[in-house]
Design a protein with these regions (language model features):
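Electron-transfer interface patches adjacent to heme c in soluble/periplasmic c-type cytochromes
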Residues: 68-80, 123-177, 295, 314-315, ...
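Residues that flank catalytic or metal-binding motifs in active/ligand-binding sites
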Residues: 13, 55, 113, 117, ...
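Globin-like tetrapyrrole-binding proteins
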Residues: 636
Length: 650
C-alpha cells in the first residue's frame, strides 16, 4: 500500500468534482475528463490550456497503491488492476476483477476484454504535473498553511543537520587520518566499504536512529509544502520509467520515443505466465463497436496517445447501455436510501435484479435525452409522488408483512444520517457551519489519543495529527476534512464512513453499542451541545424560550406542551447538579516524545516532535468555561442530539 504518504494536491480534484456538480457539467463530459483529461489538454493551444483537464485525471491517482515498491512490475500491475476495476465499477457497474484470471463465470465477459482495458492503460504513467490555479479555486489560507508547514520543516532540518554535521566531522577526521581527500556522504555512498568511513561514523546507536527519523521528516514536510504549489496528481502517456520514485514523480522534460512493450493475457493473472498478445479494447458483450474492422470491432487505437480518450468516449457514448443506467441508479439510491438495481457496482448476473427495470431504463433514457444533466434528474426525482411519500401510512403493518423490503415504495423509509451528515448537521444546528466552498483541507479536532498515537509509515513514524487552529477553519463541511488512510477520524469511522481503499457502492448503517457511548461522551458531541446552548442563550433570555428554540433548531418543530415542561424541568434539575460538580480543564500538549527501535542495532531511542498548532490553539468552548446554567442547557442539547428525530431523516 501507499505507506500513507500524503498526496498533497489531491484537494484540487475534490474541488474539481464539486465545481462540476455545481455547474451542472454534463455527465458524459465529466466521465471523459476524468479518464482522459490530460489527452484533451495536450491538444489545446498554448495560452488556452484548461488546468481542470489535468486536475480531473487525479481520478486515476485515487487508488491505495504505491508505484515505487521494491517489486516494481508487481506494483505496476496492482496499480493498473485498481484503475481498471475502479473505472469498471464507477462508470459501468461492472466488476472487472471477476474476469482477470479467467473468463467470467456468469457473464459473457472473456479475459481478453479485461486485458483490452489493461492495454488501454498500459501507457499511463503517474506524475505530479504543473497546473496553474484556476479562477474558481479557493486559495484562502495558502500563506498561513505554507508558514506553518515551513515551521515544521525548519525544525526537522535543524535537528537533521545537527546530527549530519556531527557525522560529517567524524568522516573528515577518518579521511584526514588516512591522508585522503574528504568526500561528502552522497559521493562516497557507492564506494567499497574499505574506501569510505562506516555509514554512521561518529554517531551513537541512538543518534543513528534519530538521524533516520529526521531525514524522513525532512522529506515529509518538504512534500507537504507542495500542497500550496500549482501542482496536480495526474498522469501522462509514455513508456514505464526506468526508475520510479514515489517521493517525487515528475513528468520527464522529454518523453522517450521508444515502443511500448506488448500487453499479453496473463494466465491466472500472473506476470510470470504471459499468454496471447492483446490490443487496447472495450467490453465486447456491450455490442457497441469502436472500429470499422469486422474481425476486431471492439479494439481501440494502438497509438501511445488517444487510447484512454477512445475508451472514455466509448463509455460516454449515448448508446452504451450501462453508463447512464449506472449513474441514475446511484442518484436514485442517494435520494431513496436504496438503489433500483440492488448492486450499484455490479449489474451482472451476480448482482440483484432491478426492482423496477422499466423505470431504470426510462430514467437512463431521459437523462441522456436531456443532455446528461444532474440538476434536472434531481428535480425530476424529488418532485415525484414516490419521493414525497410520508414515513407514516395508515396500514403500515400490513404493508410490511406483504412487502417487507418496501419494493413498491408505498411509504417512505426512515434513513439514518451518514457519518458526514451527522457532523455537518450538528454544525448547522449550532450555527457554526462555515459554508465556504473549496480550498485546502481542514483538520477538525479528533480524539486526542488517536491524534497523538504513533502511526507507522515507511522507515519512520508519521507526524502527529494537529487540528486547524481556528474554529472557523475546523467547522467546515466534512467533505473538506483532511483524510489519511492510516488514521481515520474515529467518530466518522464508527458511523460507517467507508474505507477509502475500495469503491463503496452502498453505505452500511449498522447500529452498534459504541455509537451510543460516542453520542453521549465524545468531545465532538459535548462541544456541539455547549455551542447550541450558547446560541439559544444569546437569542433568548428566558429558560422556557431557550428550550423551545433548542428543540426548534434540532428538530425543525416546536415542542408540545408535555415535552416543553419535561425538558424545562430537566434543565433545572441538571443546573443543581452542575453547581455541585466542577468540570476538569483539558490540557493541550505543545510537544510529544516518541519512542522507536533502531533497526540496525535493535536499541530503543527517543526523539521530540513539536506540536506548534497547540501553542496558539483556539479550542471550542469547554464545560469549564461556561456557568452551571449553560452546562445544564448543554445537557438538554446533548439529549436532543441523541434522539432518533435528530439522527434520522423521516
Amino acid at each position: 500500500l501507499s505507506n500513507d504518504y500524503e498526496r498533497s494536491n489531491m484537494w484540487r480534484y475534490r474541488d474539481y468534482v464539486v465545481r462540476s456538480f455545481n455547474k451542472d457539467k454534463p455527465y458524459d463530459q465529466f466521465v471523459i475528463e476524468q479518464i482522459a483529461g490530460d489527452e484533451l489538454w495536450e491538444v489545446q493551444p498554448k495560452g488556452k490550456k484548461d488546468s481542470d483537464l489535468l486536475i480531473a485525471t487525479s481520478f486515476l491517482r485515487m487508488g491505495p497503491w504505491d508505484p515505487a515498491m521494491v517489486l516494481k512490475p508487481q506494483a505496476r500491475q496492482l496499480y493498473l488492476d485498481d484503475v481498471i476495476n475502479s473505472v469498471g465499477q464507477t462508470f459501468l457497474s461492472t466488476t472487472m476483477r471477476c474476469f482477470k484470471c479467467h473468463d467470467h463465470k456468469f457473464d459473457p465477459l472473456p479475459t481478453r476484454d479485461y486485458y483490452g482495458f489493461y492495454a488501454t492503460f498500459a501507457a499511463t504513467q503517474l506524475a505530479e504535473r504543473q497546473a496553474p490555479f484556476v479562477k474558481m479555486e479557493n486559495l484562502i489560507g495558502l500563506n498561513q498553511g505554507k508558514e506553518s508547514t515551513r515551521h515544521m520543516l525548519d525544525f526537522s532540518k535543524k535537528k537533521y543537520h545537527e546530527l549530519l554535521d556531527k557525522q560529517e566531522m567524524a568522516a573528515k577526521a577518518w579521511y584526514d587520518k588516512r591522508g585522503k581527500k574528504y568526500l561528502e556522504e552522497d559521493k562516497r555512498r557507492s564506494l567499497p566499504d574499505e574506501e569510505k568511513p562506516p555509514r554512521y561514523v561518529g554517531l551513537s546507536p541512538i543518534e543513528q536512529g534519530r538521524l533516520k527519523v529526521r531525514r524522513q521528516d525532512d522529506w515529509i514536510w518538504t512534500r507537504r509544502l507542495e500542497r500550496y504549489e500549482p501542482l496536480v496528481q495526474s498522469v501522462y502517456n509514455g513508456p514505464v520509467p526506468k526508475s520510479l520514485n514515489a517521493r517525487k514523480m515528475r513528468i520527464p522534460k522529454k518523453i522517450p520515443e521508444k515502443p511500448f512493450p506488448k500487453v499479453h493475457i496473463l494466465m491466472g493473472g500472473a506476470l510470470e505466465a504471459p499468454g496471447d498478445p492483446v490490443k487496447p479494447g472495450v467490453l465486447s458483450a456491450i455490442g457497441l463497436p469502436t472500429s470499422g474492422d469486422p474481425k476486431n470491432p471492439h479494439v481501440l487505437t494502438n497509438e501511445k496517445s488517444g487510447r484512454r480518450l477512445a475508451l472514455a468516449k466509448w463509455i460516454a457514448n449515448p448508446s452504451n447501455p450501462l453508463t447512464a443506467r449506472s449513474i441514475v441508479n446511484r442518484v436514485w439510491q442517494r435520494h431513496f436510501g436504496k438503489p433500483l438495481a440492488g448492486n450499484p457496482n455490479n449489474f451482472g448476473a451476480r448482482g440483484k435484479k432491478p426492482t423496477h427495470p422499466k423505470l431504470l431504463d426510462w430514467l437512463a433514457f431521459d437523462f441522456v435525452e436531456h443532455g446528461w444533466k444532474f440538476k434536472r434528474l434531481h428535480k425530476l426525482i424529488m418532485l415525484s409522488k414516490a419521493y414525497r411519500q410520508s414515513t407514516k401510512h395508515p396500514q403500515i403493518q400490513k404493508l410490511r408483512n406483504e412487502d417487507p423490503e418496501n419494493r413498491l415504495l408505498a411509504y417512505r423509509e426512515p434513513r439514518r444520517l451518514s457519518a458526514e451528515e451527522i457532523r455537518d448537521g450538528l454544525l448547522v444546528t449550532t450555527g457554526e457551519l462555515n459554508r465556504e466552498i473549496g480550498g485546502f483541507p481542514i483538520k477538525p479536532e479528533i480524539n486526542m489519543e488517536v491524534a497523538l498515537q504513533p502511526r507507522m509509515i515507511q522507515f519512520s513514524l508519521a507526524p502527529a495529527y494537529q487540528p486547524s487552529i481556528w474554529p472557523k477553519q475546523r467547522n467546515r463541511r466534512t467533505l473538506y476534512a483532511y483524510r489519511v488512510r492510516g488514521q481515520p477520524d474515529p467518530f466518522l469511522e464508527l458511523f460507517n464512513q467507508p474505507n477509502p481503499n475500495d469503491s463503496c457502492d452502498e453505505r452500511v448503517s449498522e447500529a452498534v453499542t459504541p455509537q451510543a457511548f460516542t453520542l453521549l461522551n465524545s468531545d465532538l458531541m459535548n462541544d456541539r451541545a455547549i455551542a447550541l446552548a450558547l446560541r439559544v442563550e444569546k437569542e433568548f433570555d428566558t429558560l422556557r424560550l431557550q428550550v423551545k428554540r433548542a428543540v426548534q433548531l434540532a428538530f425543525g418543530r416546536v415542542p408540545d406542551k408535555q415535552e416543553w415542561n419535561q425538558l424545562e424541568h430537566y434543565v433545572k434539575k441538571m443546573e443543581k447538579h452542575h453547581i455541585e460538580h466542577k468540570p476538569d480543564r483539558p490540557e493541550y500538549p505543545t510537544s510529544i516524545t516518541r519512542s522507536l527501535v533502531e533497526e540496525a542495532t535493535g536499541l530503543p531511542f527517543e526523539y521530540e516532535e513539536i506540536l506548534p498548532a497547540f501553542e496558539s490553539y483556539r479550542a471550542d468552548k469547554k464545560s469549564h468555561q461556561v456557568d452551571p446554567k449553560t452546562r445544564a442547557l448543554a445537557d438538554l442539547c446533548l439529549v436532543l442530539f441523541n434522539t432518533n428525530e435528530f439522527m434520522y431523516v423521516y
